[in-house]
């Protein structure tokens, strides 16, 4: 049996048993071969309860709608950085050049920050004072008035209107008084303040703003249930539109006044509304007579009806005269003559001398155009008598001129010559060169016609020139032919 020799033992440490972990640099090197003598240790994943797989959740990264620079701008505008009341504004927002964009559009940062010059202005302090007093409506309207663009009040002269600072203080006080008095139910005082504001803006020719204050007064008067106050405001509002030639709006307001007055049995207000309606109807018909004569006739008929209702002879005569003129311009001479005759009758019955003279001339003109010569002569003689009684030289001039033309049309040249002589004398008394020249020409033609047929005791001008030398010499020496 062989003997066993002594066994050799070697002590091995834990460090020697652990294989070296290759570094990332060495493993990433190109051409590096793994060491076959080393065993790679693979990390073991922790087990998940109920599942053998590891579920990983990734958080979605959303892009911000605004940049950090724009976010800073929002912070600046929200907290009022750079808008200190005292001292110079700080430069916190000086680095922000661009505005920030929102869903509503782009906003410039500079427009959000209030400038120091604006905070030192009168309009800024007035708006703040109105808001501090609790007058929110005053603040809103005053802000609009003080920050609006200059208003063009004259298109031809390009005149612009802006409320001066000293007047803006007064406007603010009136607006605040309107709001406070309305809360106290002092409705008449409110309307008086609105009237003052409307008068001021109308004097500056800012008619839109003046109309706005009239409208406010009317709405407050209607809320008050004070019918007399409501009627007064409507009449003032209508008169404003009448002054500025917005006649249809004026008519609408005056008609409301009339119907309400009739419902309340307020005779005095109804009569006042009637007179204003008549005047407005006549003015509007004068504007429409060339462009829309049928509509003008409808307004004149309404004016005629109202004038007869209130028994106003002057307005009735004017309505009839205007109707006659429109029908004459339309070529309806029969109806024109009918209305002019009614015009003459109303004027004579009411002893309206001026209108009676004018009516006589109008009737005669229509009769002459319709070849009613005898009737025209009669009407003209009536007009001449009225003018002579009233010592109206201009009326005498017109009557004698038309009378001479009427006599010429009828073939009575002797009476025509007499009328033209009277016409020339009246023209010289008027000291009007144009009328004098016109009368001289008419008289010259009349004298020529007369001498052509009646010169030399009825022989005529042509036989005298051809045969009677003695008569020619007498004419040349004495001026008598």
From Swiss-Prot:
GO terms for cellular component: axoneme; ciliary transition zone; cilium; motile cilium. Keywords: Cell projection, Cilium, Cytoplasm, Cytoskeleton, Flagellum, Repeat, TPR repeat. It is found in: Cytoplasm, Cytoskeleton, Flagellum axoneme. Residues 1-53 are annotated as: Disordered. Disruption phenotype: Defects in flagellar motility and cell mobility. One of its GO terms (biological process) is cilium movement. Interacts with TAX-1. PANTHER family: TETRATRICOPEPTIDE REPEAT PROTEIN 29. Axonemal protein which is implicated in axonemal and/or peri-axonemal structure assembly and regulates flagellum assembly and beating. This is Tetratricopeptide repeat protein 29.
């Amino acid at each position: 049996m062989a003997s066993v020799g002594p066994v050799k033992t070697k002590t091995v440490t834990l460090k020697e048993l652990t294989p070296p972990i290759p570094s990332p640099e060495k493993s990433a090197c190109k051409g590096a071969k793994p060491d076959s003598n080393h065993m790679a240790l693979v990390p073991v994943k922790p087990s998940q309860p109920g599942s053998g797989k590891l579920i990983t959740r990734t958080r979605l990264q959303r892009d911000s709608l605004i940049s950090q620079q724009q976010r800073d701008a929002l912070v600046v505008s929200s907290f009022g950085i750079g808008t200190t009341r005292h001292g110079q504004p700080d430069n916190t927002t000086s680095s922000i050049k661009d505005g920030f964009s929102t869903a509503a559009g782009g906003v410039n940062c500079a427009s959000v920050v209030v400038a120091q010059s604006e905070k030192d202005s009168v309009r800024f302090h007035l708006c703040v004072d109105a808001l501090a007093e609790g007058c929110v409506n005053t603040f809103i309207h005053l802000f609009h008035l003080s920050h609006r663009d200059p208003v063009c009040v004259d298109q031809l002269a390009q005149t612009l209107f802006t409320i001066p600072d000293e007047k803006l203080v007064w406007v603010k006080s009136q607006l605040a008084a309107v709001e406070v008095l309305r809360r106290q139910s002092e409705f008449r005082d409110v309307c008086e303040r609105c009237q003052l504001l409307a008068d001021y803006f109308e004097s500056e020719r800012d008619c839109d703003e003046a109309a706005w204050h009239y409208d406010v007064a009317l709405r407050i008067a209607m809320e008050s249930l004070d019918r007399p106050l409501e009627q007064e405001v409507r009449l003032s509002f209508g008169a404003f539109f009448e002054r500025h030639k917005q006649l249809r709006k004026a008519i609408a307001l005056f008609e409301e006044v009339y119907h309400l007055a009739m419902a309340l049995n307020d005779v005095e207000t109804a009569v006042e509304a009637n007179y204003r309606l008549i005047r407005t109807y006549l003015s509007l018909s004068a504007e429409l007579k060339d462009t829309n004569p049928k509509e003008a006739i409808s307004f004149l008929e309404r004016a005629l009806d109202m004038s007869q209702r209130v028994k106003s002879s002057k307005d009735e005569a004017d309505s009839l005269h205007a109707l006659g003129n429109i029908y004459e311009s339309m070529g309806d001479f029969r109806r024109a003559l009918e209305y002019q005759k009614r015009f003459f009758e109303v004027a004579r019955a009411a002893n309206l001398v001026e209108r009676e003279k004018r009516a006589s001339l109008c009737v005669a003109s229509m009769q002459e155009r319709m070849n009613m010569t005898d009737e025209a002569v009669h009407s003209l003689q009536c007009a001449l008598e009225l003018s002579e009684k009233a010592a109206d030289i201009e009326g005498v001039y017109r009557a004698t001129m038309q009378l001479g033309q009427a006599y010429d049309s009828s073939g009575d040249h002797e009476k025509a010559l007499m009328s033209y002589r009277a016409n020339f004398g009246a023209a010289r008394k008027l000291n009007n060169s144009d009328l004098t020249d016109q009368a001289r020409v008419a008289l010259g033609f009349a004298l020529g016609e007369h001498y052509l047929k009646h010169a030399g005791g009825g022989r005529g001008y042509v036989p005298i020139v051809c045969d009677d030398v003695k008569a020619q010499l007498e004419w040349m020496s004495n001026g008598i032919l």
